[in-house]
Design a protein with these regions (language model features):
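Membrane-interfacial helix-loop-helix
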Residues: 1-40, 80-136, 143-146, 175-179, ...
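Hydrophobic alpha-helical membrane segments of integral membrane proteins
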Residues: 34-74, 113-172
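Transmembrane alpha-helical core residues of multi-pass small-molecule transporters
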Residues: 78-82, 157-158, 170, 186-190
Length: 208
């Protein structure tokens, strides 16, 4: 009970601070400098729990301020800090509460079995092609038998392409807005079509 209360308290505090101070934090990021690096990582980590700022916008801003390479490293670091915090909170903080809620959905058991059988490949795939929402992936993996190192490495690898693209789009936005928006738009369409095909195939198998 104490673990649950402490975990929920920490989570709520992080979200509240981020939500109240988001404008000030964004201003610091845009100024650049050492402090803005840590603030950028903090905001990205908070967005893993609660999207106070759309991640596409935040990663794009970070890319615009720090450039493609440094921006991608900063965004990836923040994303992994938040992702691992989510994972460990699910596993050790509010495990019973999370399991009780998720088990109300029969599909979750299928996902959990899938992650347990093919954890590394399954996690990478779920990051590259987000058929399953990221918070659900984090929670299921935290509740499952997936090792934290496997979860960390697979999640990091799976997040790299999207973060690199967002950093590139952000860095080139000021010089060519149409190109940047169009490039990410094409990426979104491709991901959507892949998701559509996967869902359609699953529905076809279920109905047959």
């Amino acid at each position: 009970m104490i673990k649950r209360i402490a975990s929920i308290g920490i989570l709520v505090l992080i979200i509240v601070i981020g939500f109240i101070q988001k404008d000030e934090l964004l201003h610091i990021i845009k100024e650049g400098g050492t402090l803005s690096i840590f603030i950028s990582m903090l905001l990205v980590a908070i967005c893993v729990f609660f999207p106070i700022i759309p991640f596409t916008v935040l990663a794009g801003i970070i890319g615009a301020v720090f450039g493609i390479t440094h921006g991608a490293i900063i965004s990836l670091t923040g994303a992994m800090v938040g992702t691992m915090a989510f994972f460990f909170l699910s596993r050790y903080g509010f495990r019973d509460f999370a399991r009780e809620k998720l088990l109300k959905y029969p599909k979750v058991r299928e996902y959990e079995s899938f992650f347990n059988r093919n954890s590394f490949v399954a996690i990478i795939t779920s990051r590259l092609i987000p058929v399953i929402p990221a918070p659900v992936v984090n929670t299921i993996c935290g509740l499952s038998k997936v090792r934290w190192l496997t979860f960390f490495s697979a999640s990091a690898i799976g997040k790299i392409p999207n973060i690199l693209l967002l950093s590139y789009v952000g860095s080139s936005f000021s010089s060519n807005k149409l190109y940047s928006v169009g490039l990410y738009g094409i990426y979104i369409v491709i991901v959507f079509l892949i998701n559509f095909v996967i869902v359609y195939r699953r529905m076809s198998k279920t109905s047959s």
